[in-house]
Design a protein with these regions (language model features):
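Rossmann-fold NAD(P)-binding glycine/threonine-rich loop
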Residues: 13-20, 25, 34-56
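A short hydrophobic/small-residue beta-strand
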Residues: 28-30
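Active-site-lining helix/loop region of Rossmann-like oxidoreductase modules
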Residues: 55-59, 63-196
Length: 196
């Protein structure tokens, strides 16, 4: 059946396997498994393919907010961009009994080590135009996925904390992430663009 846009919401592997073919078919794509774009060569190839075919790659806000504001990192001096993500050990498949830092470093490295748990880090990096700093924590006391964003620069300071509830249809995904796709789809053709 004809369509204008394809939504990838399966996995990093699915995005890597199918995104280019979607773009070559002249269709826009919404990539939810943003970790696939941590591979600079793959990302550059997709962008060039989209350009050649006059189509777009859409990255939804996913499980966070403020990607529109983080984009100022592409044009203004930034002193700090840190994402601190805290998840329950069960969601990370780790038998951890006390709060433990599992990762500290750049987003592109975190995506390689934890490909199923760091789409937020890659989304923020894409918005900022650079690989951001990431801390990944496991905490048995946390029953939700929590993302804290610390963003400082010549524009001022931003702190945001998001505690996501799981999607009722897929507990591995946050409900906010699922809703962000629906919001993006609803507004694709709107003449009023907010937060771009």
């Amino acid at each position: 059946e004809p369509c204008d846009v394809i939504v990838e919401a399966a996995s990093v592997a699915a995005a890597r396997s199918h995104a280019k073919a979607v773009l070559e078919a002249g269709k826009d794509i919404i990539i939810m498994s943003v970790g696939a774009l941590a591979d600079e060569e793959f990302k550059a190839d997709l962008i060039e393919t989209a350009r050649k075919n006059s189509v777009k790659i859409h990255i939804p806000s996913g499980a966070v907010l403020g990607l529109d504001n983080i984009k100022v990192g592409q044009i203004a001096r930034v002193d700090k961009i840190l994402l601190k993500t805290t998840k329950s050990p069960a969601s990370l498949n780790r038998p951890i009994t006390e709060k433990t830092q599992l990762f500290g470093g750049k987003a592109h490295d975190c995506v390689r080590e934890f490909p199923k748990n760091t789409n937020v880090a890659q989304s923020l990096s894409l918005a900022a135009g650079r690989s951001i700093d990431v801390e990944l924590w496991a905490d048995p006391a946390e029953d939700r996925n929590m993302h804290e964003i610390f963003f400082e620069g010549e524009f001022g300071e931003i702190y945001a904390r998001i505690r996501n509830v799981p999607s009722p249809d897929n507990p591995a995904t946050s409900y906010l992430a699922a809703l962000s796709i629906l919001s993006l789809l609803r507004n694709l053709d709107s003449p009023l663009v907010i937060g771009a």
